[in-house]
Amino acid sequence: MNKRFFTLLSLLFAVLFVSAQNSDVEKMLKDIKAVTGFEKIEKADTTRQYYLMKVTQLLDPQNPAAGTFEQRVMLGHRGYDRPMVVVTEGYGADYAFKSPRYMEELTKIMDANILFVEYRYFSGSTPEPCNWDYLTVANSMEDYHNIITSFKPFYNAKWASTGISKGGSTSIFYRAYYPEDLDVSVPYVGPLSGAVEDGRHESFLERVGTKAERD
């Protein structure tokens, strides 16, 4: 009888603890002005609380009259005293948002929180109407800056950015635009093209293999 009682009591305390944690994170999200909506999402990783958020961004930070759009961001909350890893995705982020088993490597290594930011003009972060004039590196960096400065007051440990492929390039760009926002940047791959036809590899592609293979 006593054993069953203490088991039930332990379960009750666990439920209350998780509920209190959820309420605390959700209160923070409600307090952040840029966050205009969020929903809790389930992941295989039970050590973090995951939320898919909508963040209101200016289409053109230099011209607020141009309007706004909603950008999708995922928060994986580990603890306010833990580091924060910002994934500067260069494209759409459905693979991270929808996969229950997605885990970013640095987040796991550092036992960190995660902010996964989908790039503007991709998937669920596409403005309506879709005016491509506002898809610039400078405007995209302002998106990240707005998100990071909105969350920094709540997470006081170290901040890192990371990305792969175009996300790696984006991580480099962000470091150049706002070096004081982050403590470290870890671009896994960061291709930097000089032009539509870069000029550094075309001559190789014109010679490699046989003519039939190239054609």
What label would you give each PLM region?
Residues Y155-S165:
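Alpha/beta-hydrolase fold nucleophile elbow
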Residues S165-K166, V189:
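Catalytic nucleophile serine of serine hydrolases
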Residues Y134-P153:
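Alpha/beta-hydrolase active-site loop
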Residues L182-D215:
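A catalytic-pocket lid/entrance helix-loop region that shapes and gates access to the active site
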